[in-house]
Amino acid sequence: MEELLKKFESKKPEIVFEWKDSETEAEGWIVINSLRGGAAAGGTRMRTGVTKDEVLALAKTMEVKFTVSGPPIGGGKSGINFNPKDPRKKEVLKRWYAAAKPLLKTYYGTGGDMNVDEVNEVIPICYENDILFPLEGVLKGHHKKDEQDTNQIIKQLSEGVPLIVRNKKLTPNPSRDYSVGDLITGYGVSEAILHYYSIYGGEIKGKRVIIQGWGNVAGASAYYLAQAGAIIVGIIDVSGGIVNKDGYTFKEISSLLEQRSSNFLETNNMLSFEQVNERIWGIGAEIFIPAAASRLLSQDQLDQMISNGLEVISAGANVPFGDKEIFFGPISKSADERVSVLPDFIANCGMARAFSYFMQNNCQLNDIAIFTAVSETIKEALLKTFKKNNAKTNISRTSFEIALEQLI
């Protein structure tokens, strides 16, 4: 596996597109690891400090993710180095998508990612640029559909991603307009935990959970885990956090999600980042959900959690461990050898799987069908891994082996 991984990591990407904005200091990259199956896809992220190497690592992660979620295409990623809170953000995105248009019309598909909203930014800005949908390039390059089928699938994608979730079991509030795009990745991260306990043995009820982040993925996964009977004991976010050894009620977690007006935690009894960072890792929890930025978790934080009862990590963030290696650095290995690590390309494949689902001919466009497709895909991937290795350790390594055999 290590040799396969080294080969995959060191292979140069097929296409690197570099952009410098003419009107601001923004710069960006699209990295396409390969045009496997004639196309590649991966979301667009924006933050201060994005680098080409970060985008390359995420493109490779996407390629592995598509072995689970489908379709069988290459991995790509877009990254823009710019402050997402800058009032010029929208104008920067408009110029970015105008520049990226030739790729998006032919063989590259994108979507929302960190600090870039799928429904309110990516879809409408692409449409203004005569890109029928952000995934048009995948339809052209991979699916090779005729005009009639392309239009039908664009319709399914256009209706499916912003579809409002009304089912009472799936939405935190049926009267608020939570879309599939808002909830589906976090749902998948929590379903990965539920399937893990049903496959490997154990019961979700009463398990304590630490959540890192409070954006869409973190918030939704906390909500669904609390709904299933798990107890959230702490949330840490870039701006601070909360901890409670006895845990928060399902009602309290729901209201934290409802109060959120941004991608950050907002509550009256917030601790500072320093205070929460000091206390949260040793509070004691069986489940850890890293769902903030990439490469945040340190060896010391991992050791503290393991010493205090950690059983399983479900990766809401891509590449959550603070290693410099793209895959399987020392912290990642240390986690995988000691606890159950459900890797990013399985746990957070929800949106990728939803896209793949919408690209099928005549798919059912209702919330239950979409969420079921995601849950079943994650279950199937974990069952494949369990079949090859039924131990509760080295789950990530085994899952990588299965994926890399398809790619190399």
Which residue stretches match the model-derived regions?
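N-terminal glycine-rich anion-binding loops that anchor highly charged ligand groups
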Residues: 23-36, 67-72
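Conserved active-site and cofactor/substrate-binding residues in soluble primary-metabolism enzymes
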Residues: 50-54, 87-91, 95, 117, ...
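Glycine-rich phosphate/diphosphate-binding loop of Rossmann-like nucleotide-binding domains
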Residues: 165-282
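Short, Gly/Pro- and small/polar-rich lid/capping loops
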Residues: 1-20
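Adenosine-phosphate binding glycine-rich loop
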Residues: 45, 306-408
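N-terminal cap/recognition module
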Residues: 32-64
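Rossmann-like adenosine-cofactor binding region
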Residues: 240-244, 248-341
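Glycine/serine-rich phosphate-binding loop and adjoining beta1-alpha1 elements at the start
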Residues: 68, 72, 77-204
